[in-house]
Design a protein with these regions (language model features):
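Short, structured beta-strand/loop micro-motifs enriched in basic residues and often containing a Trp
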Residues: 136-148
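Hydrophobic (often cysteine-bearing) scaffold residues that line and stabilize catalytic clefts
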Residues: 97-101, 192-195, 199, 220
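N-terminal capping segments
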Residues: 1-120, 165-168, 176-182
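Acidic, Ser/Thr/Pro/Gly-enriched interdomain connector segments
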Residues: 178-214
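Conserved hydrophobic/aromatic packing and binding residues within compact polymer-binding modules
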Residues: 224-227
């Protein structure tokens, strides 16, 4: 499948301004990775904490699925206004609103734990010109500018932010890799650690919306049971060899 990115793209008018909400289903959307301008991105911004990176990606995924969120630069901060009510969980937004590429990434970073006060100035979200220095100042990210990262998708990870300074910004949602290691082939409710993060990450790649916290709690068990049911497995909420195989753990 390759690398999939998510972004706020363009209004229903194929211009920078439009009505509130996604009128076409493609204003805030996913697509295959591409080189900006056919050449390269300016940089790749990567959170050092994989959990923060995953939350950035999940927020963008939720925005892509919520058709009440559209694209328009003149009302770019209305998503923030609505998402703020739900601790930046954009899946809970129920009022038509808009964002643009950098405002969406700003809200996603807030969902990951970066303070709103860091990412806004006088109520205005960071832009494609200010996003890089702002995130760098937090100490939470690494910045990559070599062609191996900016003009190639092989080294990208989920949650990476691809920035073309002054132009556009997108978020990596899906790659062919998992940032966590599987060190235990039998996991169940009560299990903890990196192996649990591995399966939570894989379940999210299959449509779940879990916190990647390394704790196999009730929500993770329910997600496992739903996955097992959808894939014709014994529905017991226990992750063993058969469930791991269906999850793609042994690719």
């Amino acid at each position: 499948m390759g690398v999939i990115i998510g972004h706020a793209s363009l209004s229903e008018n194929k211009t920078v301004n439009g009505s509130k909400g996604d009128q076409t289903g493609r204003e805030v959307c996913t697509r295959n990775w591409y080189k900006y301008g056919g050449k390269s991105w300016s940089c790749v911004i990567r959170f050092r904490d994989p959990e923060m990176a995953d939350k950035v990606a999940r927020c963008v995924e939720m925005a892509c699925r919520n058709d009440l969120i559209g694209y328009s630069q003149d009302t770019r901060n209305t998503l923030l206004k609505e998402a703020r009510k739900y601790n930046y969980n954009v899946s809970k937004v129920t009022v038509p609103c808009n964002t643009d590429c950098s405002a969406l990434v700003s809200v996603a970073c807030m969902y990951a734990g970066i303070p709103e006060s860091t990412l806004t100035l006088n109520g205005n979200c960071a832009t494609t010109r200010t996003l890089q220095p702002i995130l760098k100042s937090t100490g939470e990210v690494d910045i990559y500018t070599t062609p191996q990262y900016t003009a190639n998708s092989d080294r990208l990870k989920r949650g990476d932010i691809l920035l073309a300074v002054g132009h556009h910004v997108v978020t990596v949602l899906k790659t062919d890799g998992n940032p966590y290691r599987l060190m235990n082939n039998l996991l169940k409710e009560g299990s903890m650690g990196e192996s649990v993060k591995f399966i939570q990450y894989e379940l999210n790649r299959h449509g779940a919306n879990l916190e990647v916290d390394g704790v196999f709690g009730k929500k993770t068990k329910l997600a496992v049971m739903l996955f097992q049911k959808e894939n014709g497995l014994l529905v017991d909420g226990i992750v063993g060899t058969k469930t791991l195989t269906k999850l793609g753990a042994y690719k």
